[in-house]
């Protein structure tokens, strides 16, 4: 049997040419170009290098603090470290020193501070303690400093008692500015103080002290000063007599009365008041007994013949 070869086509087929590959563009794509440009920006690179660690740290801290137990343990550890530092000997105050205050005021200062020594300097609020002390009536200003060796130095500028002020509410001690210092009898006084009376007397203490100084020539015959109508002063003597001073020029008017008394002892006579409120006129008011005696003498003088001057 003869093997037949496959039939060949009468018309030869032309082979299909392979597709031509697209030309390669060496330029980068827009996205690649923008990414490259962004990466080459110094600010972006720094932000990326710094931002990733910061974000990682923030995430870690957030995760750690998300557990209340761990937060409580961390807080307790910090508090323990703080306590150890605060309780170190070099930070403790062991001694309290008070300077510039009398014995009575010193006791008030100690009571106001109410410090339980020894105490850590971190537990002392000096501004708050200063406010306590300056709220005390006898304290003008206070200065507090923590010095080496655990010494708390307190410097007091004390109000000096200058006068005793009498009002309807009782007696009180005031300083040279008329500011309340203490109730009368609540503290010892180094010397007797001038007595002032009347409403508003505390507002004119400097003038009152000047008048008391001017009247010192009368020694202990001056009982005190009374403020009248919150405008002027009356000088009250121990025998009950008064010197009525004007609102303006009180010191000069008082000097006139003292000069008259030096010449004629007018204040030692039977007078109830010497009125010098009018600068151009001095008025003397006699006691009732003196007025009766004066009237008797005037009556006798009227009954006598003219020219008869015998008593």
From Swiss-Prot:
Q: Which family does it belong to?
A: Belongs to the FtsQ/DivIB family. FtsQ subfamily.
Q: Which residues lie on this side of the membrane: Periplasmic?
A: 68-311
The protein's job, in short, is:
Essential cell division protein.
Looking at the record's lineage, which domain of life comes first?
Bacteria
What Pfam families does the annotation carry?
A: FtsQ_DivIB_C, POTRA_1
Provide the alphabetized UniProt keywords.
Cell cycle, Cell division, Cell inner membrane, Cell membrane, Membrane, Transmembrane, Transmembrane helix
Q: Which residue intervals are topologically Cytoplasmic? A: 1-46
Membrane-spanning residues where? 47-67
Q: Where in the cell is it found?
A: Cell inner membrane
Output the Gene Ontology cellular-component terms. Answer: cell division site; plasma membrane
* Record region (Disordered): 1-28
Q: How does it sit in the membrane?
A: Single-pass type II membrane protein
Where, if anywhere, are coiled coils annotated?
Answer: none
- Ranges where the POTRA domain occurs: 91-159
GO process terms (BP)? cell septum assembly; FtsZ-dependent cytokinesis
- Whose protein is this, by species? Jannaschia sp. (strain CCS1)
Put simply, this protein is called Cell division protein FtsQ
């Amino acid at each position: 049997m003869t093997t037949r070869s496959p039939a060949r086509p009468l018309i030869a087929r032309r082979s299909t040419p392979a597709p031509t590959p697209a030309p390669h563009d060496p330029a980068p794509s827009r996205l690649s170009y923008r990414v490259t440009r962004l990466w080459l920006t110094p600010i972006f690179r720094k932000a990326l290098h710094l931002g990733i660690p910061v974000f990682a740290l923030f995430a870690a801290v957030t995760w750690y603090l998300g557990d209340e137990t761990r937060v409580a343990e961390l807080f307790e550890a910090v508090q323990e470290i703080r306590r150890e530092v605060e309780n170190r000997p070099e930070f403790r105050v062991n001694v309290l020193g008070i300077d510039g205050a009398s014995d009575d005021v010193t006791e008030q200062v100690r009571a106001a501070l109410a410090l339980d020594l020894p105490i850590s300097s971190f537990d002392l609020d000096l501004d708050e303690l200063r406010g306590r002390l300056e709220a005390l009536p006898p304290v003008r200003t206070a200065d507090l400093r923590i010095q080496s060796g655990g010494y708390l130095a307190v410097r007091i500028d004390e109000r000096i008692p200058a006068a005793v002020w009498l009002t309807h509410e009782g007696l009180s001690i005031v300083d040279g500015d008329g500011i309340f210092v203490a109730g009368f009898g609540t503290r010892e006084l180094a010397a007797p103080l001038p007595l002032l009376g009347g409403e508003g007397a505390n507002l004119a203490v400097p003038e009152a002290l000047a008048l008391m100084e001017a009247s010192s020539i009368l020694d202990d015959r001056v009982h005190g000063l009374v403020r009248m109508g919150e405008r002027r002063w009356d000088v009250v003597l121990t025998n009950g007599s008064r010197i009525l001073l004007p609102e303006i020029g009180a010191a000069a008017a008082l000097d006139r009365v003292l000069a008259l008394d030096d010449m004629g002892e007018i204040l030692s006579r039977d007078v109830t008041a010497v009125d010098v409120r009018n600068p151009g006129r001095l008025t003397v008011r006699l006691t009732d007994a003196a007025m009766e005696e004066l009237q008797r003498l005037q009556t006798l003088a009227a009954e006598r013949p003219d020219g008869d001057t015998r008593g």
